[in-house]
């Protein structure tokens, strides 16, 4: 492998992602905004950005997750680098307010 090919394989490009975050229904609005701000800051550090944020609100879960039957849903479309998504996923996994989350790469079809 040539040196230029090796460099190209290490360069991360921005990709389109959709992220759904399900929070506990008792999460204060300020905490919801703080979580979204943290996600935005993480992707902005690597030149990414939100393209759309929709608060779907409180909805019944399809099945019981832990002790929760309802969750507060937030849907986010964004441009981000894969390393940003890994960091966001780690941060959301350790947050006590987050019941579940899923990031989908929309560039892969």
UniProtKB/Swiss-Prot annotation:
GO terms for cellular component: cytoplasm; ribonucleoprotein complex; ribosome. GO terms for biological process: translation. Keywords: Ribonucleoprotein, Ribosomal protein, RNA-binding, rRNA-binding. Pfam families: Ribosomal_S6. GO terms for molecular function: small ribosomal subunit rRNA binding; structural constituent of ribosome. SUPFAM superfamilies: Ribosomal protein S6 (SSF54995). Binds together with bS18 to 16S ribosomal RNA. NCBIfam families: S6. Belongs to the bacterial ribosomal protein bS6 family. This is Small ribosomal subunit protein bS6. It comes from Dehalococcoides mccartyi (strain CBDB1). The gene is rpsF.
